[in-house]
């Protein structure tokens, strides 16, 4: 797997002024690898140190989960309105949540709306993007954000 050196994200670094350089570096690497052990190996550190940095990042940025942390970061790196011009910002958030969370019930709890409403919104998103099935939405989301990174 190709890893982009966190030093290449100097402009994006300005979006997270409360993070230390080590925390930002860990955050960028974690968002690329999504694995604590791989980040620890890459940085020649113990996994406990990586976990501590990620916990500090979540606290300073004000998020609770790894999904939220990842979404905040890619939202700063990628202009979702440009990537998905056919979707509203709420639909983009639901699509991103659907791409990370395994169940619609989790998304419903996260957005405090009914599970059936999540399904209806996903169908609208699918239709707006011209996709055949819901599972293809996940792949499309990751393919599009990867191209824009």
From Swiss-Prot:
Keywords carried by this UniProt record: Activator, Cell membrane, Conjugation, DNA-binding, Membrane, Plasmid, Transcription, Transcription regulation
Entry's transmembrane regions: none
Single Gene Ontology BP annotation: regulation of DNA-templated transcription
First-listed, main subcellular location of the protein, grouped into a coarse class: membrane
InterPro entries: Sig_transdc_resp-reg_C-effctor, Tscrpt_reg_LuxR_C, WH-like_DNA-bd_sf
SUPFAM superfamilies membership: C-terminal effector domain of the bipartite response regulators
Gene Ontology molecular-function annotations: DNA binding
Membrane topology designation: Peripheral membrane protein
Gene Ontology, cellular component aspect: plasma membrane
Keyword Transcription: yes
Statement: the UniProt record of this protein carries the keyword Transcription: yes
Function of the molecule: This protein is essential for positively regulating the expression of transfer genes that are involved in the conjugal transfer of DNA between bacterial cells.
Name used for this protein in its record: Protein TraJ
Naturally occurring in which organism (per UniProt): Escherichia coli
């Amino acid at each position: 797997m190709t890893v982009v050196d966190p030093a290449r994200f100097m402009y994006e670094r300005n979006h997270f002024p409360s993070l230390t350089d080590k925390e930002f570096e860990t955050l960028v690497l974690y968002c690329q690898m999504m694995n604590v052990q791989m980040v620890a190996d890459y940085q020649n550190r113990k996994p406990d140190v990586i976990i501590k940095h990620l916990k500090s990042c979540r606290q300073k940025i004000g998020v609770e989960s790894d999904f939220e942390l990842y979404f905040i970061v890619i939202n700063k790196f990628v202009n979702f309105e440009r990537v998905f011009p056919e979707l509203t910002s709420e639909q983009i958030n639901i699509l991103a949540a659907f791409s990370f969370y395994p169940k619609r019930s989790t998304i419903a709890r996260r957005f405090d709306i009914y599970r059936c409403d999540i399904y209806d919104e996903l169908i609208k998103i699918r239709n707006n993007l011209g996709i055949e099935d819901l599972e293809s939405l996940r792949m499309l989301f990751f393919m599009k954000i990867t191209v824009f990174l």
